[in-house]
């Protein structure tokens, strides 16, 4: 049993500024996992994510960094386009692709004291999935997409 399990999609982000366009990985679960990985190892952690397996490079880099990651295949990877104005506090965000929602079946084998749900879009986690996990441990939810 892990102390903390973060469940959420790793995103492909297109960042557009007046000066350039870059592509990078992102998402709550991505940043959460790297932050937890910097803490002392007395807290056990795992990440459950879902993305198009042909775009799994961010997962491979996380595994190389020593992060415990389980990749569930999805038809798509969540793909955000973030367009920033000259004033970087102003942006427009578009969803260019959505990954498959997480299911109870994908999470049956997962055991943790705390489940952190890194939601990005409103249908990443059904109420049934949240209730299921709440029956197994404590649940915290990032409210960005919930």
Question: Predicted segment positions?
Answer:
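Short glycine/serine/threonine-biased micro-segments
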Residues: 6, 24-25
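Histidine-anchored nucleotide/phosphate-binding helix
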Residues: 27-39
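Conserved N-terminal subdomain of the carbohydrate kinase-like
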Residues: 12-23, 38-124, 128-138
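Short, flexible segments with low predicted structural confidence
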Residues: 7-8, 33
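Short, flexible active-site-adjacent loop segments at beta-strand->alpha-helix junctions, enriched
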Residues: 10, 121, 143-145
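Extreme N-terminal starter segment of soluble prokaryotic enzymes
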Residues: 1-5
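Hydrophobic, aromatic-enriched interface-forming segments
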Residues: 136-146
């Amino acid at each position: 049993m892990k102390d903390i399990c973060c469940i959420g999609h790793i995103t492909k982000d297109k960042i557009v500024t007046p000066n350039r366009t870059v592509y990078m990985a992102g998402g709550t679960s991505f940043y959460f996992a790297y932050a937890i990985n910097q803490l002392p190892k007395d807290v056990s952690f795992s990440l459950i994510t879902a993305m198009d397996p042909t775009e799994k490079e961010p997962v491979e880099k996380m595994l190389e960094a020593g992060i415990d990651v389980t990749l569930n295949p999805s038809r798509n990877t969540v793909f955000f386009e973030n367009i920033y104005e000259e004033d970087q506090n102003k942006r427009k965000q578009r969803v260019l692709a959505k990954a498959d929602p997480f299911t109870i079946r994908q999470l049956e084998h997962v055991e943790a004291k705390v489940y952190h749900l890194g939601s990005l879009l409103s249908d990443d986690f059904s109420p049934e999935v949240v209730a299921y996990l709440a029956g197994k441990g404590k649940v915290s939810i990032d409210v960005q997409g919930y």
